[in-house]
Regions:
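C-terminal cap of metal-dependent C-N hydrolases
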Residues: 87-148
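Short, surface-exposed, polar/charged, turn-prone segments marking secondary-structure boundaries
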Residues: 1-2, 44-47, 118-123
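General structural signal for secondary-structure boundaries
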Residues: 1-2, 58, 102-103
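Short, flexible, glycine/charge-rich loop motifs used to bind or transfer phosphoryl groups or to couple energy/partner
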Residues: 6-8, 80-81, 117
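His/Asp/Glu-enriched, well-ordered alpha-helical/loop segment
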Residues: 11, 17-96
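A short helix-to-beta-strand connector/capping loop
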Residues: 13-14, 123
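Active-site glycine- and acidic-residue-rich loops that bind
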Residues: 1-7, 73-75
Length: 151
């Protein structure tokens, strides 16, 4: 019921952005005390692309709620568009890549995902930050960093 309400609100334009606080607590931490949040940064885009492949959302809406709108709301003047004068922050998604979320493949320190076992269609293939490739098909370039946007 809650999920349906959120999907309808997203599709009706009542939700401006989708993000993740990415709370990568170890399972042992979650078992000991009440800690809020889940690790989600690695799967949020893939889950949305999977929803696109199921005709539940458009690519344009994903682009807006996961990039463009946040850039506008937070006045990140050089972010959120693929145009001259903007930072070259780009993702390339393989919308036809089928894969299964596995804890062994989680990069986050927590080593688990609430979406473990989900079979998804669509995955990030390349990530470019300021014109530099930082990720390509499972491999990271740890020498490249983005800018601090909080300044």
């Amino acid at each position: 019921e809650d999920n349906e309400y959120l999907w309808n609100a997203l599709l009706d334009g009542q939700i401006d952005t989708i993000g993740t606080d990415h709370a990568p607590h170890l399972l042992s931490e979650k078992e000991k005390s009440v800690v809020f949040g889940v690790p989600g940064i690695e799967t949020s885009l893939a889950l949305m692309i999977d929803a696109y492949n199921k005709n539940e959302i458009s690519l344009e809406l994903i682009e807006n709620v996961m990039s463009n709108n946040a850039a506008k709301i937070f006045s990140l003047d050089k972010k959120g568009k693929l145009e001259e004068g903007y930072d070259a922050d780009i993702i390339v998604v393989d919308t036809n890549r089928q894969w299964t979320v596995k804890k062994e493949e989680i990069e986050s320190k927590c080593g688990w995902s609430p979406f473990e076992g989900y079979e998804l269609l669509g995955k990030n293939y390349i990530t470019v930050v300021n014109g530099n490739i930082v990720y390509i098909d499972g491999e990271f370039d740890l020498t490249v960093r983005g800018d601090d946007v909080s300044e």
